[in-house]
A protein has these predicted regions:
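Conserved catalytic core of nucleotide-sugar-dependent glycosyltransferases
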Residues: 98-199, 211-221
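A conserved acidic beta->alpha catalytic loop
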Residues: 13, 18, 25-26, 32-34, ...
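Short glycine/serine/threonine-enriched helix-capping/active-site loop
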Residues: 41, 116-121, 241, 248
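Short beta-strand-to-loop acidic/aromatic patch adjacent to the donor-nucleotide binding site
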Residues: 84-98
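Active-site acidic Asp-centered loop
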Residues: 43, 90-94, 119
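Hydrophobic targeting segments
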Residues: 5-11, 30, 36-41, 77
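C-terminal catalytic/acceptor-binding lobe
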Residues: 2-5, 15-23, 29, 183-316
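Active-site-proximal specificity loops/subdomain of glycosyltransferases
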Residues: 42-85
Length: 316
């Protein structure tokens, strides 16, 4: 077994609105990975056709409801990986790495860390239709808090750096605790990053999930399980791979309404234990697929407008 065989990439492809940008970004992402082992989980909504051609490296799953499925899909993929896989990198299918040796570097860092963010800086590229627009540069979460630990206590996304895009951890962590998969409008990467450093009730988290809400309590239980697994493995804290990541354009960030979407979910009283049905080997389902939460989710995903040609910086 080589070190290269020990790490697999898992990514997801979910395109119920049929965005052209998402298809093209996935093609560029997958091509850039080269021969690095990668399993793509494609999720089709209801009776929509799958877009990716059949392949041993594509796991097709069908969802009943329109919601944020990414973390659930990644969790379902883990059992499909070969036993030679000891580390898993979960990566958004719209990024490109500047540093090609990131897999080896990540494995070295995972000898002592719970998880590794696979970049130190991200460049959000402009729309291909507006190539003269300036890219937006952002420091990564782990690089930021390593250099400025006080950034964690500020309670603002822009203060502590970007929490998303590309991470890696031990397969055994994902088998025992999984990723947190009940953020049904997204932002799981943000709240998980705080849990990785032992702050599951940080201001950033309570702003998104609510203070003393059922959603927050559900997240705290997952966080406690994660820390227990980390202790049993003798790993802790976070590392990062120094290097730049390019994020391919797919619509205006403002159309994703990062804070507003979670605020609305709180107003609707979302409780994962009550409102989600966990079916083995399937994406999550809503218990009430015609209720106010389902209606909100359908409207939200329809308004993301990922084929738009302008972008703006987000603060959450």
């Amino acid at each position: 077994m080589t070190k290269r065989d020990a790490l697999w990439v898992v990514t997801t492809y979910f395109n119920p609105a049929g965005y052209r940008s998402r298809r093209e970004n996935y093609r560029r992402f997958r091509t850039a990975l080269g021969d690095l082992p990668c399993l793509t989980v494609e999720c089709a909504l209801a009776d929509q056709p799958f877009e990716l051609p059949p392949s041993p490296d594509v796991l097709p799953l069908r969802a009943h409801d329109a919601l944020w499925h990414k973390e659930r899909l990644i969790n379902l993929a883990i059992s499909k990986l070969p036993r030679s896989c000891h580390f898993v990198a979960w990566i958004d299918a719209d990024v490109l790495f500047q540093r090609l040796d990131w897999p080896a570097r990540a494995q070295t860092l995972l000898d002592r860390h719970l998880a590794v963010q696979l970049f130190s800086d991200v460049v959000q590229l402009p729309s291909p239709q507006r190539p003269d627009d300036l890219p937006i540069r952002t420091r990564g979460f782990v690089a930021t808090i390593t250099e400025k630990p006080d950034a964690l206590s500020v309670g603002r996304f822009d203060a502590h750096g970007h929490t998303g895009y590309a991470w890696a951890t031990h397969r055994s962590v994902l088998e025992a605790a999984g990723l947190y998969d009940a953020c049904i409008v997204g932002s799981a990467d943000h709240v998980m990053a705080h849990a990785f450093v032992g702050h599951p009730t940080a201001t950033c988290v309570t702003r998104l999930l609510g203070d003393h809400s059922p959603h927050l309590r559900h997240f705290e239980r997952w966080s406690a399980r994660l820390q227990s697994v980390a202790e049993s493995l003798g790993v802790s804290g976070l590392g990062f791979v120094s290097g730049e990541l390019s994020h391919l354009f797919h619509g205006a960030i403002s159309d994703r309404r990062y804070f507003e979407r979670n605020q609305r979910l709180r107003q609707l009283g979302f409780d994962p234990t009550r409102d989600l049905i966990e079916v083995p080997d399937e994406p999550h389902r809503l218990r009430d697929d015609a209720g106010p939460i389902a209606c909100f989710l359908r409207d939200y995903f329809a308004q993301r407008n990922e084929d738009a040609v302008t972008d703006e910086k987000s603060s959450v």
